[in-house]
Amino acid sequence: MASACASSTIAAVAFSSPSSQKNGSIVGATKASFLGGKRLRVSKFIAPVGSRSVAVSAVAADPDRPLWFPGSTPPEWLDGSLPGDFGFDPLGLGSDPESLKWNAQAELVHSRWAMLGAAGIFIPEFLTKIGVLNTPSWYTAGEQEYFTDTTTLFVIELVLIGWAEGRRWADIIKPGCVNTDPIFPNNKLTGTDVGYPGGLWFDPLGWGSGSPAKIKELRTKEIKNGRLAMLAVMGAWFQHIYTGTGPIDNLFAHLADPGHATIFAAFSPK
């Protein structure tokens, strides 16, 4: 679905060009309806170009979709087809179709890493706080002793993550080129989208095989939770810088003394 969404977005930008309007396409009406807040339906139009015909499709734009600011007009390149698209791009970072496609994948993978990072910060710290576990805090994890030195661990991580990220990058450049298992060639994935490999390892419950509306709903939830996780990880990092403790310790301290243990106390002279 992600590749299809990206394609539809690319088409939307391409169709809004002056050359497309001169060729008798329906883009003029499409753009006017979009800016005027009217619902558009997907339809096909055959426009003669020289001695051949070119089939184009109008991109569906739903005026009732949620926007980051109610009543605002979303940019042309954010037509609501991408998961988590609420029309927010004040810097125009997605105005170029290729940049939009790349940024969508970058946000997706950063969201997933942030969700893993947030779980690794909050859950062990909370369980240690209530006495279930006895683990070092996330901000001192690099100071602990492991089965080998940190340089060796870094090299191992670099090789493993580099291999995985290399295959992900190849799939972005040429969708579907990594759908065959490199170790067991008989294991192949079909009908997958860029960033959503599916299969037994990445979709064991088969949630990605539902209706398009359901799939987009799940992908939107993933992006929204990922964005929240990125903010949470950044917040935990700043909390440790200014307080010297983690978010769970800060929470318990605030609950014990809500009048004094606040965010303002970290910036008050002692």
From Swiss-Prot:
First-listed, main subcellular location of the protein, grouped into a coarse class: plastid
GO cellular component, one term: chloroplast thylakoid membrane
Positions contributing to chlorophyll a 2 binding: H110
Binding-site positions, chlorophyll a 6: H254
Residues given in the record as chlorophyll b 3 binding sites: E165
GO BP annotation list: photosynthesis, light harvesting
Membrane topology: Multi-pass membrane protein
Binding-site positions, chlorophyll a 4: N225
Chain positions recorded as chlorophyll b 1 binding sites: W68
MF terms in GO: chlorophyll binding; metal ion binding
Range of residues in the leader sequence: none
UniProt binding sites for chlorophyll b 2: R112, V155
Residues that coordinate or bind chlorophyll b 4: R168
A Pfam family this chain is assigned to: Chloroa_b-bind
Family: Belongs to the light-harvesting chlorophyll a/b-binding (LHC) protein family.
Comment block on domains: The N-terminus of the protein extends into the stroma where it is involved with adhesion of granal membranes and post-translational modifications; both are believed to mediate the distribution of excitation energy between photosystems I and II.
Protein name: Chlorophyll a-b binding protein, chloroplastic
